[in-house]
Swiss-Prot record:
The active site is at 97 (nucleophile), 122. This is ATP-dependent Clp protease proteolytic subunit. It is an enzyme of class 3 (hydrolase). SUPFAM superfamilies: ClpP/crotonase.
Length: 197
């Protein structure tokens, strides 16, 4: 994958950064694509770095993700809550499945989506092979994750857990405005506020 470079002028000359490093200087972390262990490790490292730089200043997590591995997403979720720095979340494009959970996990009052973003929640999925006992163990783990994610989304959105259980039974797509009404985000953002925050 090609990563663009940006050149910055300073009193000491020019310095070239890859675009993600330059965004990191502005406390912007970009979560794009499927969430897996490698992506989670990169996002977590950036969150920890930015907290060490300034634990009181907002971190802006931009999300455009179809979701992915629940355990990798929960590692990001736990880190967002673990660090002191507030994490603002902004959905651009889509936040589906685990991406929607991370969007909703942002600091209350600082969870946003752009007008044409799509947000989708559903139950976790998985596959299993092997002996009947192994398949049963995996099925029980998926059901446990389903209950845990529904409780988390209920707490974060203000919806009753019974509604989450019903709505996540199948793919449940929402527009940005519908996600705001549901409580997954706090506002639909059409323009970036002055000051870049």
């Amino acid at each position: 994958m090609y990563v663009p470079m940006v050149v910055e002028q300073s009193g000491r000359g020019e310095r070239a950064y890859d675009i993600y490093s330059r965004l990191l200087k502005e406390r912007i972390v970009f979560l794009g694509g499927e969430i897996n262990d490698q992506v989670a490790d990169l996002v977590i490292a950036q969150l920890l770095f930015l907290e060490a730089e300034d634990p009181d200043k907002d971190i802006h997590l931009y999300i455009n993700s179809p979701g992915g591995v629940v355990t990798a997403g929960m590692a990001i979720f736990d880190t967002m809550n673990y660090i002191k720095a507030p994490v603002s979340t902004i959905c651009i494009g889509q936040a589906a499945s685990m991406g929607a959970v991370l969007l909703t996990a942002g600091e209350k009052g600082k969870r946003f989506a752009l007008p044409h973003a799509r947000i989708m929640i559903h139950q976790p999925s998985g596959g299993s092979r092997g002996q009947a006992t192994d398949i049963m163990i995996q099925a029980e783990e998926i059901l446990r994750m389903k209950r845990e994610l529904n409780r988390l989304l209920a707490d974060l959105s203000g919806q009753p857990v019974e509604r989450l259980e019903q709505d996540t039974e199948r793919d449940f797509f929402m527009s940005a405005e519908e996600a705001r009404n549901y409580g997954l985000i706090d506002a639909v953002m059409t323009r970036r506020p002055d000051g870049g925050d």
